[in-house]
Amino acid sequence: MPSTSEVGHAKNVANFADIIAYCTAYGTTYNPSKTALQLTSLNALLTSAQTEIANVTTAKNTFDTVTGDRQLAFEPLKSLATKILNYISVTDATSQTIADAKTINNKLQGRRATPIDTTTPPPSEGAGGGISVSRQSYDSLTENFSASIDLVSSIPSYTPNETELTVDSLTTFRDNLQTANTDVINAEVAYSNARISRDNILYSENTGLVDTALD
């Protein structure tokens, strides 16, 4: 009976429901002395298991939805970062400020500050796998975009006519990125907790649905 794939979890619960149906069909001849095997207990366990399966499905759907929402929220980031850099380049910002802006933009675009030496083989996985080519995690992207906002805020002549490039608009955009990322983190935690709770009901030693079925 035991199966631990996503489909398998539901199958285990369905099989348990079949077992209860057979036990119920026996009528009064099914009268175990062990409380956990009595029909009231079996039905209660089945209800709990069905609830946990449904909770996992709901949590996964939520996680998938907010993950897609986050991807959409971050989609304009690179092109917006390029527009910011282009505007900074025509202000009276110092050469160092422009250099800093280029560094931030490189991070947002996922570029290295210096080219990779393609003549040197990359470290093997056994050696630790090497350093990531880019800082493309959503946390890092948000952090670097915040740095870009701080930088343009320090340039007196940064007064774009384009609404999307104003500090207020950039701040709103950054806040939306943070919200989208936080939503995914929270949904991931909820999804993980739902799976843990489901597994406790289904697979706990002695008291879980699977072990109860094997009794």
Predicted features and spans:
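Basic/polar low-complexity intrinsically disordered segments
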Residues: 1-215
